[in-house]
Amino acid sequence: MAACQEVRHRMTSLSADLKNRRNAERATLIARRLAAPAADHARWSALIEASLRGGFSALEGMIVGFCWPFQGEFDARPFVTDLQGRGVRAVLPAVVAKGQPLEFREWWPGVAMSNGVYDLPVPVGSSVLTPDALLIPALGVGSQGDRLGYGGGYFDRTLVALHPKPLAVGLAFELSRIATIVPQPHDVFMDFIVTEAGIEAAVAGGLMKLSAEDCRARVAALAAERGLPRRESSGAAPAN
């Protein structure tokens, strides 16, 4: 009995230590990102958008989830709006309950919105759809494709809950690189990481640099392997 209590104590202490470490890492990374000069932020964002346009054209015909930019994150809206013109339906995440997977509501320019968690806008009254691919902002990026978010665990729970699993594309700036987030069993790794330095795929042993052509091929292969896009992805997008 005493041995079991000691093990539980060590696990609790480790969990508390890791939580404190991650929170400190988050504060550092947010401050670093917000301190980036506007000109650098714009240049990095343009490079990320160019990589997305070059490597992820295979997302056409899918339902693509993205996030409203927050605290200096890359703004995916121009890329997503361009995809919408080529048959993609776009969705934004909404928190429906603490500790639950996210709900995804269809978005287009001009859709009615209200503020949700973190005061981020979410669509009101639009269709709830299941994404085939997710463009997920990363506060920190580890060397294995592990992603540090804001601590709510919403994307981890969502990626576990959705079958087939959507393509997970982590978006970050190079200043968000960390050695590791010390992944736990509940942490879900990204399929791809895109920064201003280019595109990487998460593979056994780490991250592998991809050309735009190689990325398109890998996206298509993963989509076919997982049975994406889903049937509901085939509807026409609403007029903007």
Language-model features: where?
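N-terminal active-site beta-alpha-beta segment that forms phosphate/nucleotide-binding
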Residues: 2-4, 8-130
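Surface-exposed, charge/polar-rich loops and edge strands
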Residues: 2-20, 24, 31-35, 129-134, ...
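Conserved residues at the C-terminal ends of beta-strands
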Residues: 67, 137, 196
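Short glycine-rich anion-binding loops that position phosphate/pyrophosphate groups of nucleotides
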Residues: 69-72, 139-143
